[in-house]
Regions:
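Short, well-ordered secondary-structure micro-motifs
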Residues: 54-56, 102-104, 130-131, 157-158
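Active-site acidic carboxylates
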Residues: 1-90, 112, 145, 154, ...
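Short phosphate-binding/catalytic loops that engage adenosine nucleotides
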Residues: 140-142, 171
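Internal catalytic-core helix/loop-beta-alpha segment
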Residues: 70-126
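Active-site-proximal beta-strand/loop segments in catalytic clefts of secreted hydrolases
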Residues: 45-48, 95, 122, 149
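Histidine-anchored nucleotide/phosphate-binding helix
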Residues: 30-37, 129-139
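A short glycine-rich beta-strand->turn/loop micro-motif centered on a GG-aromatic cluster
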Residues: 118-125, 142-156, 176
């Protein structure tokens, strides 16, 4: 069986930059450990915006420029980048919360093999839940896991609400 790890948006702007939180900083070491110990295929998503972010639909609802491609805030958190340094992984740039490209890339990677998927990253209540639900919709017979110890939300309350939502959608929550 193949194992797939999705590292969702552990970028500088979400850890300790424009939209960073103490909770995000607190999960970095757990995420790096998970990456270092993982044996399988790794996909790393990058929230990717451009100079016109404030003119976008997202920018009108979240008026905080972040993850602008080419800026320091768009890059991976240094600890996570170091954990990935010796790993082969597929980078996936996405312009919105969930990646519609990710299921296609996973299908290509697994071929006919059985597989499961684990997600870690930021923010639990926006991009992690969006990608988890997209993956569960595309692979309804596969086990999808989220390691809560490697995730943080915008707030503790919304992190917990996202975990509850994912549980209701038959996504397995570990590390609570």
């Amino acid at each position: 069986m193949k194992h797939i790890l999705i590292v969702v948006d552990i970028q500088k702007d979400f850890v300790d930059g424009a939209l960073g939180t103490a909770e995000a900083v607190a999960i970095v070491d757990n995420a790096a450990k998970k990456i270092r110990e993982f044996d399988g295929d790794i996909f790393v998503t990058y929230d990717t915006h451009f100079e016109n972010y404030m003119e976008s639909a997202e920018g009108s609802k979240l008026p905080v420029p972040h993850c602008i491609k080419g800026t320091d805030g768009w890059t991976l958190n240094e600890t996570v980048a170091q954990a990935l340094a010796d790993k082969k992984y597929t980078a996936v740039e996405k312009i919105t919360f969930g990646s519609v490209e990710l299921p296609k890339l996973i299908k290509e990677a697994v071929g006919d093999e059985d597989f499961d998927i684990t997600l870690i990253g930021l923010c639990t209540d926006i991009c992690v839940v969006s990608n988890a639900l997209i993956l569960k919709a595309n692979f309804p017979e596969k086990e999808v896991y989220v390691d809560a110890a490697c995730c943080a939300g915008v707030t503790v309350e919304t992190h917990n609400a996202a975990l509850a939502t994912m549980k209701m959608c038959q996504i397995n929550i570990e590390g609570e």
